[in-house]
């Protein structure tokens, strides 16, 4: 039992098996990335390996419950090419998330916007998990693009505004079926991963569409009186994003 606690193997009956259990093969479409969004990096954290196994097990459990209740999981409603126009992808995701300028103005806080987006996605049978024991430097978000019950995981150690951006970033991976683990979703990332950087750009367009930003009343004040932190705060509050995003 002590070894079970140390090696995170529960139940400890694993230690009485006649041989090492076979590892389940991961989906080929799942790109497990960790450091710098580098697909060649090796996952070394025990916590992250355990988390990956746990969320897959939880998905299997939910699928079993659906089967017992004779329910069919919903198919994820959007599938677009990774080469599709960024505005098209962003608009499709905003529509899926039921985001409009009026709705975003009511959020006021990123955590409220995040709860709204999670609630909408769960209606489509998207499984949302939040890691609590993994450093953001190792994983800020991950996605596994199953056609039914896709998985998105966020890092609870991140601030709500960061998790909101990560959620949108991972949604792009789901929509384009380019899932993976991301440790850096900062828009100024020097990552060479083209898809990851594109996901960052689209995530920004999901949260702050250029046409809505341009027509925001405060933008007129900035053009007339110059850039000021108070104006930036007004815009960031209305779009429920962090001030530094601007």
Language-model segments: which ranges?
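Short juxta-domain linker segments that transition from a proline/glycine-rich
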Residues: 1, 5-246
């Amino acid at each position: 039992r002590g070894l079970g606690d140390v090696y995170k193997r529960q139940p400890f009956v694993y230690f009485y098996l006649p041989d090492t259990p076979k590892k389940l093969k991961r989906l080929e479409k799942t790109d497990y990335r960790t450091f710098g969004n580098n697909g060649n990096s090796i996952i070394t954290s025990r916590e992250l390996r355990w988390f990956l196994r746990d969320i897959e097990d939880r998905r299997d459990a939910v699928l079993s419950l659906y089967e017992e209740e004779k329910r069919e999981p919903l198919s994820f409603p959007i599938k677009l090419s990774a080469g599709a126009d960024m505005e098209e992808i962003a608009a499709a995701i905003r529509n899926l998330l039921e985001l409009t300028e009026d709705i975003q103005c009511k959020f006021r806080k990123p955590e409220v916007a995040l709860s709204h987006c999670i609630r909408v996605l769960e209606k489509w049978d998207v499984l949302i998990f939040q890691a609590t024991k993994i450093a953001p430097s190792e994983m800020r978000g991950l996605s596994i693009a199953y056609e039914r019950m896709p998985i998105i995981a966020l890092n609870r150690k991140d601030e709500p505004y960061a998790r909101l951006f990560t959620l949108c970033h991972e949604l792009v991976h789901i929509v384009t079926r380019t899932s993976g683990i991301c440790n850096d979703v900062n828009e100024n990332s020097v990552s060479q991963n083209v898809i990851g950087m594109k996901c960052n750009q689209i995530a920004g367009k999901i949260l702050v569409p250029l046409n809505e930003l341009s027509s925001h009343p405060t933008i007129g004040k900035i053009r007339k009186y110059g850039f000021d932190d108070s104006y930036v705060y007004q815009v960031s509050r209305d779009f429920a994003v962090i001030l530094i995003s601007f």
